[in-house]
Amino acid sequence: MRPIRLAVAFGLAALITLGCVPGPLSTTWIEPGTPPTPYRDLIVFGISTNPIVRRAYEDNFVEALKGAGVQARAAHTLLSDRDVGRSRAVQEAVGRSGADGVIVTYLAGENPDAAPSGGRTHVVPSLYGRLYPYYGHILSEVTAAGYYANYRALRLEANLYDAGRAKLVWSGRSDTLDPSSEQTMISEVIAAMIGKLKADGFLPTS
């Protein structure tokens, strides 16, 4: 599958001007008090205002997961564009799939002059804790008109939920990305996310 450049995939170059910070992955969070479990069957939900971009985004993430030896499916193969915004339809699709994990991923807007997080671990809002209602909330927020116009920086965020418990177990954010850079490809950042998930014990190593 052809790699997706940020500028092409998300159409944000005209909206945001920002610098590129070296290094693909910035911060991670792991559920405290619970030993990591390797997830072997995942569903990937990409969040985007454009259905075509969302499907391509999910496909690239799934391809990378399969390349790492993990069974994975794109949400668009289980849900119509209409149903992807309906929480009940999403819950039913996840339940029918038999998947043990769900990844929700999107480009998060950020203002670079905001206070630094102070380390390699980011603070996860309480709303993130449960897949439902988190999914509906983030879908509504990111797809709202003008969402990206309010920010001058982007970070790729990926959140892994245990499908059975519908609970967040791992969250990661990339370093600041430059959507206008021809050198910045979404596949590079996805690969870094998957590598970190594997290193943290949430994906099988073989």
Question: Model-derived features: where do they sit?
Answer:
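Surface-exposed short loop/turn segments
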Residues: 86-160
